[in-house]
Design a protein with these regions (language model features):
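SDR active-site lid
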Residues: 178, 184-197, 203
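Intrinsically disordered, low-complexity terminal regions
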Residues: 195-227
Length: 227
């Protein structure tokens, strides 16, 4: 259902069973897949490619022009996968000519006022707390949790199954399975719950990983783990 009070550009491609509420704005050069819901006052802007079963809440701006001085109006993209929840006032910028694309994977939960800047690559099944923000060209891999108010510096990588605690300024890369906290960011522990639940590791192995994280592994070595 598309409300007659919504604006949908005639050139936009809208899938089946899409609900677009009153006062939503759908720009030209937009593709929205099947079974998506666009709430009132949400804006889906030019260059956005959205998969299926996504919900975009009130006041979100999806596919906004990059906040980057080198951007000169190129035709760049924002690609969003399937089954994402994008809450109120989230802003996601499309790419610049460095990568041409900002990417959001599948099954992510972006809480109120999250900002993903240009050329950010967000993986699958991530949770980004209220007002968490990434600068340009960041990589946030699969199954990452960014607490509320986290700020990720330009170009940093937050690697799979890591957790960055509330209010942290992530000015360096975070290795996999690590809990990071403090300002400036520092090692806080390992994500033992995930190692136990998802990787089925024994307590002995988890203890060895914890010791290695403290004594034996620098960030550069740890980041060689595929994300």
């Amino acid at each position: 259902m598309i409300s007659p009070l919504a604006y949908v550009n005639p050139d936009a491609k809208i899938g089946k069973d899409v609900t677009i509420h009153p006062f939503a704005y759908i720009d030209k050069n937009v593709e929205i897949g099947d079974n998506c819901t666009i709430m009132p006052y949400a804006s889906i802007l030019s260059g956005t490619r959205m998969g299926t079963n996504n919900t975009v809440y009130q006041g979100a701006i999806i596919g906004a022009t990059p906040q980057d001085f080198k951007f000169k109006g190129e035709d760049t993209l924002l690609k969003i996968g399937n089954n994402n929840t994008i809450r109120e006032k989230v802003i996601i910028n499309r790419g610049t000519n460095t990568t041409d694309c900002t990417i959001v994977g599948n099954g992510n939960f972006l809480l109120e006022s999250v900002h993903l800047a240009h050329d950010t690559h967000l993986g699958n099944n991530c949770v980004l707390g209220n007002a968490a923000k990434t600068a340009g060209n960041c990589i946030v891999a699969d199954n990452v949790i960014l607490g509320s108010g986290v700020i990720v510096k330009h170009g940093c990588r937050i690697v799979t199954w890591s957790l960055v605690k509330d209010g942290c300024r992530a000015n360096k890369d975070v290795p996999p399975y690590i809990v990071a906290a403090h300002n400036p960011i520092a090692y806080y522990g390992i994500n033992a719950y995930i190692l136990r639940k998802e990787q089925k590791l024994t307590e002995e192995i988890i203890d060895d990983i914890a010791k290695a994280s403290v004594k034996c592994i620098n960030v550069g070595q740890a980041l060689k783990t595929p994300y």
